């Protein structure tokens, strides 16, 4: 991912509608970013805001969370917005925890819910 700032977008299944609505409502701010997203989330974001520059990776449980983690560790992702569903058990919960750990270790801005994402996004420089 050469050039430009990169924002990662991820949403658990029960939060994908929220992420699509977030992308639609914030398309102007998001259009300043290169976006990487897990597979299904990226598809939903593109459906909601087709003009955004979104690269879809694998689905989260199939390695997409780990792909984004790798991009964080190499400095290719500058911020993470991850709409987490805390009420549904996730079979790939260890991957999710590892991803959040990497965001903390590499000290990138991270929003885990809509309210934080709304506050964070305008403060980020693309």
From Swiss-Prot:
GO CC aspect terms:
cytosol
What reaction is this protein's catalytic activity? dihydroxyacetone phosphate = methylglyoxal + phosphate
Q: Which residues form a coiled coil?
A: none
Q: Which domain of life is it from?
A: Bacteria
Q: Which GO terms describe its molecular function?
A: methylglyoxal synthase activity
**Similarity field:** Belongs to the methylglyoxal synthase family.
Q: Sorted alphabetically, which InterPro entries does this protein's record hold?
A: Methylgl_synth (IPR004363), Methylglyoxal_synth_AS (IPR018148), MGS-like_dom (IPR011607), MGS-like_dom_sf (IPR036914)
Alphabetical GO biological process terms? methylglyoxal biosynthetic process
Annotated organism of origin: Rhizobium etli (strain CIAT 652)
Q: What residues sit in the active site?
A: 65 (proton donor/acceptor)
Q: What is its EC number?
A: 4.2.3.3
Q: What name does the UniProt record give this protein? A: Methylglyoxal synthase
| Positions that bind substrate | 12, 16, 38-41, 59-60, 92
Q: Which cysteine pairs are joined by S-S bonds?
A: none
* Matching SUPFAM superfamilies: Methylglyoxal synthase-like
Q: Name one Pfam family in it.
A: MGS
Where does the record place the MGS-like domain? Answer: 1-126
Residue intervals passing through the bilayer: none
């Amino acid at each position: 991912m050469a050039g430009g700032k990169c924002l990662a977008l991820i949403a658990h299944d029960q939060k994908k509608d929220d992420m699509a609505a977030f992308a639609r409502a914030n398309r102007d701010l998001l259009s300043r970013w290169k976006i990487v997203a897990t597979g299904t989330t990226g598809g939903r974001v593109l459906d909601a805001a087709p003009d955004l520059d979104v690269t879809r990776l694998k689905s989260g449980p199939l390695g997409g969370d780990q792909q984004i983690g790798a991009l964080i560790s190499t400095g290719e992702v500058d911020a993470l917005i991850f709409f987490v569903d805390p009420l549904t058990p996730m079979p790939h919960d260890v991957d999710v925890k590892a991803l959040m750990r990497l965001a903390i270790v590499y000290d990138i801005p991270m929003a885990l819910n809509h309210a934080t994402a709304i506050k964070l996004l305008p403060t980020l420089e693309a």
